[in-house]
Amino acid sequence: MAKLTKETFVESLKEMSIKEVMELVEAMKEEFGVDPAAAVAVAAAPGEAAEAAKTSVKVVLKADNGKKVQIIKAVKDLLGGSLMDAKKIVDNLPAVVKENIKPEEAEPIRAALVEAGAEVSVE
């Protein structure tokens, strides 16, 4: 019996009807004792783990959209620094406003900056 290549197998699958593919899956379950749904769940797990591992983020000020004064005031209020410190941040875009913070902490900061007229991202 000739060895079946992946390419040949895929081409054969393309020619099958949905019913035939379902029957093939059932036959594979019986023959190998494998549940394809379990394999899909295992394959999806690494991506979910990466999302769960994202415990710290940074808030990045991307653009001032012509609202520089309002944004400088918002940055000053958020960081508790001086107007000059806030101005330095806003003058050098893109700029990290806060980093190594929890995603829950980043959302109010992002919202305040957006309300002031800024373009902001949480990374």
UniProtKB/Swiss-Prot annotation:
GO molecular function per UniProt: mRNA binding; structural constituent of ribosome
Record-level GO cellular component terms: cytosolic large ribosomal subunit
A single BP term in Gene Ontology: translation
This protein's UniProt keywords: Ribonucleoprotein, Ribosomal protein
Amino-acid biosynthesis is among the record's keywords: no
Disulfides per UniProt: none
Pfam families recorded: Ribosomal_L12, Ribosomal_L12_N
Role this protein plays: Forms part of the ribosomal stalk which helps the ribosome interact with GTP-bound translation factors. Is thus essential for accurate translation.
The family this protein is said to belong to: Belongs to the bacterial ribosomal protein bL12 family.
Subunit architecture: Homodimer. Part of the ribosomal stalk of the 50S ribosomal subunit. Forms a multimeric L10(L12)X complex, where L10 forms an elongated spine to which 2 to 4 L12 dimers bind in a sequential fashion. Binds GTP-bound translation factors.
HAMAP family: Ribosomal_bL12
Annotated protein name in UniProt: Large ribosomal subunit protein bL12
Organism in which the protein naturally occurs: Mycoplasmopsis synoviae (strain 53)
